[in-house]
A protein has these predicted regions:
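Outer-membrane beta-barrel signature, preferentially recognizing the C-terminal barrel domain
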Residues: 250-275, 305-308, 344, 399, ...
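Gram-negative outer-membrane beta-barrel transporters
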Residues: 327, 358-365, 453, 458-461, ...
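Short acidic/polar hinge/loop motifs at secondary-structure boundaries
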Residues: 103-131, 428-430
Length: 613
């Protein structure tokens, strides 16, 4: 499988290497839950390969995600602190995340969002990002999807061990093993990360260090019952403990900067796949249990919660002819949460179908419909249409792509419960489901030598957006109008001469809430500019990435300062199987703010070694 890194062309490099192939042949799964070559996909997708993930070397997955077009990340004070991953300017809780098919959303969270701050990069083999309203396959509330795949087994036995250390007394160790034969295969990973961190809050005069520990275990076991039937089990356990400032004792309400956040998520999935002739069937059941506890100077604080998510899914495909494929499925889910004061549970049923057709040999279209029945908010029907048209241009192809999608989001269990215990005006409000729609139009030019250029315009909006009352803190209110997000994504990947390659993206994002004001913490302009140099066969490689964010405002409407952050990565294959690697994050020691009141990491160097067998 060839590597694809989506990025924008700030400049089209001359001296393009004569080596490489068209990147339109890369196989993508996230768009329609079935493998499809990029050339046939009309939606906007990007991917990070195993090589790219390892070379960049970041400890947390959100650090990798922020290098991609259309993705903005805000972090509140270092590793393990709350981090929002926004796709195309939408709220972080509209971003859905899956690991080996497991939905890792937390029903006890404010709006049932994934806890990205506890999601580490160790053991991750591939990440695919689907941008825009994507409710068809993943639930009508999905405003973007991040599909994460861990390392898979191959014939025989293989593995790796890795250790790294660096600034803030940070250390990371991990191990991966995989093996199998024609009948049985397995893969397992274990990783431990520790850091003393830095002072997370700018107003904490004690200047204490807020550390974080994370232990992540992940395993998968597969059994080929017959040539057509496969059984697979996935299980994971994540435990995180972080220090932070500015918390309150739940009994005395005393303020403290000695605060602890304990997090644990246990999840598993069992799946059965059957393929025969023109039909395939996938039936799966997954369960996750997420628990969060907060302490102030050793005593209970606020924000505790436990959430459980059960999901039963069926996906089928029928290849009706050489040019026509049908995808259909069922999605049954139960959300439950308990915060110690109240507990709630809700069921939702979803049914969907999508037509995929190849017309005129170079026109690929999809048309899908989804029906959801929410226990509290009734039935909703949503749609998705997409198309990709290919034509030869020079020594390559141009793809004209377009997509349109709709969705809805029912108020979360937390939002409903908060309003029931709040006060006017929120307590007097009957929250309704949000509705969304969006479209994008784009051009892609992919040359046979590896040059990849993409330009996409997107426009999407949310009707009746739910938001927290920051004026009176009464609870959750509902906007009487549309919140909008539109803009342009530019992407470029170019092999250059003398071992150099260019990797860049730029996003312009114009957002407004239902009052016409810019939405908070969404930079109008984001860019990543990466340059990498590697020797023949990549015995040694070094890369530089510059990340910039401009024209953002805070929740008060106050402008946030623009910034640029420079990261450096290097990797040296000493002998077969042994790599020494290092990186410097924030090379220029930029003093920048993502969320007012919270500090960001200064210049930090890390060194490590990896042995593969």
């Amino acid at each position: 499988m060839k590597k694809l890194v989506t990025v924008l062309a700030l400049a089209a490099a001359s001296n393009v290497s004569a080596q490489g192939e068209s990147r339109l042949e890369e196989i993508i799964v996230v768009s329609s839950r079935v493998p499809m070559p990029l050339r046939e996909i009309g939606t906007s997708v990007s991917a990070l390969s195993a090589d790219e993930i390892r070379f960049r070397g970041y400890s947390s997955l959100y650090q990798l995600l922020r290098t991609q077009a259309g993705v903005a990340v805000t972090n509140t004070g270092g590793m393990g602190t709350p981090s929002a991953v926004r796709i195309r300017g939408e709220e972080g809780y509209r971003t859905r995340a899956y690991i080996d098919g497991i939905d890792i959303s937390d029903p006890s969270n404010l709006q049932m969002s994934p806890n990205f701050e506890h999601l580490m990069s160790a053991g991750v083999d591939r990440v695919e990002i689907l941008r825009g309203p994507q409710g068809l396959m993943y639930g009508a509330d999905a405003g973007g999807v991040i599909d994460i795949t861990t390392r898979r087994a191959t014939d025989g036995f293989s593995g790796s061990v890795e250790a790294e250390g660096g600034r803030y007394d940070s250390q990371r160790v991990s191990a991966n093993v995989a093996g199998g034969n024609d009948r049985v295969d397995f893969a397992a990973s274990a990783a431990d990360y520790e850091t003393e961190g830095f002072n997370s809050r700018a107003d904490d005069l004690s200047r204490d260090r807020d550390g974080y520990d994370n232990t992540s275990l992940h395993g998968r076991l597969g059994f080929n019952v017959t040539e057509d039937l496969r059984l697979e089990l996935v299980a994971r356990d994540v435990e995180g403990e972080g220090e932070y400032d500015n918390c309150y004792n739940a009994v005395t309400f005393a303020l403290s900067n000695d605060c602890i956040n304990e997090y644990e998520q246990q999840a598993w999935r069992v799946g059965l796949s059957y393929a025969h002739g023109s039909l395939t069937h996938q039936l799966a059941y997954s369960h996750s249990d997420t628990e969060r506890q907060f302490f102030a100077a050793g005593a209970p604080s606020f924000g505790n919660g436990e959430g459980e998510l059960d999901r039963t899914t069926y996906t089928g495909t029928w290849k009706a002819s050489e040019d026509i494929n049908l995808v259909y499925g069922v999605d049954l889910r139960t959300d439950a949460f308990d915060n110690g004061y109240a507990d709630r549970e809700r069921d939702q049923e979803g049914y969907y179908a999508e037509y995929q057709g190849n017309h005129l040999d170079n026109l690929y279209v999809t048309a899908g419909i989804r029906y959801d029945d929410n226990e509290d908010f009734g039935s909703h029907t949503t749609y998705r249409l997409s198309g990709a048209y290919l034509l030869p241009v020079g020594p390559g192809e141009m793809k004209i792509k377009a997509a349109y999608g709709t969705g809805f989001r029912a108020p979360s269990l937390y939002e409903l419960n908060y309003n029931e215990t709040g006060f006017p005006p929120a307590s007097e409000l009957d929250l309704d489901a949000e509705e969304s729609e969006g479209y994008d139009l784009g051009l892609v030019w992919a040359m046979d030598n590896g040059l990849y250029l993409e330009a996409t315009y997107f426009d999407q909006d949310i009707d009746k957006e739910i938001y927290f009352d920051l004026d009176f803190f009464s609870g959750y209110l509902q906007g009487q109008g549309r919140s909008e997000s539109k803009g342009v994504e530019l992407v470029a990947l170019a092999p250059l001469a003398l071992g150099f390659s260019l990797n860049a993206n730029y996003t312009y994002n114009d957002t407004s809430d239902f009052d016409g004001e810019q939405r908070a913490r969404r930079p109008e302009q984001l860019f990543n500019l990466g340059l990498k140099w590697a020797t023949a066969a990549e015995r040694f490689a070094i890369g530089l990435n510059v990340r910039g964010a401009y024209d953002a405002v805070d929740t008060s409407g106050e402008a946030l300062a623009d910034y640029e952050v420079v990261d450096l990565s290097a990797d040296w294959r000493v002998v077969k199987g042994l790599h020494l690697f290092g990186r410097v994050e924030n090379l220029t020691d930029e003093d920048y703010v993502e969320v007012p009141g919270f500090n960001s990491a200064g210049a930090a160097a890390y060194l490590g070694a990896r042995y593969s067998f």
